[in-house]
């Protein structure tokens, strides 16, 4: 087959599918509700044949019309209110607008949330404190004497000894 012919058929199918009336008719919730109601009615009449009696036929017709109106309003409400973003916006618009709403336009910088401080921490979880300029307690020889409190230096957290804080100048 000719390649141009196949490409033309594919292009024609794409044009038919993306035809503007086709797209807008299925994006309109009322049209979708009408189609769903028609399918429900066809199934209803296929399963339950209406009675032959004239009084019962009128009563059945009234019930069917009430069902049609109720289904139309139900489908219209569901499609229009709950799926509004799908019919009226593209997915990217929904994502961008949700980010915009969440961060109020992105102008504000939201500070990170710090974890809450726990008052009953275990002793090994707390940073070890050593005297500034001295060696850690594990590296002292066994025969060394403990320093008296008068001549010892103030205790500094071990993390600050290894990595001095930028803010303590």
Curated annotation (Swiss-Prot):
Subcellular location: Host membrane; Virion
Residue ranges of the TM segments: 28-48, 60-80
Any one GO CC term of the record: virion component
Topological type in the membrane: Multi-pass membrane protein
Glycosylation sites: 88
Region feature (Disordered): 107-169
Principal subcellular localisation of the protein: host cell
Bias kind Low complexity: ranges: 144-154
Keyword annotations from UniProtKB, A to Z: Glycoprotein, Host membrane, Membrane, Transmembrane, Transmembrane helix, Virion
Similarity remark: Belongs to the asfivirus B169L family.
The protein, known as: Transmembrane protein B169L
Organism for this UniProt entry: African swine fever virus (isolate Tick/South Africa/Pretoriuskop Pr4/1996) (ASFV)
Lineage: Viruses, Varidnaviria, Bamfordvirae, Nucleocytoviricota, Pokkesviricetes
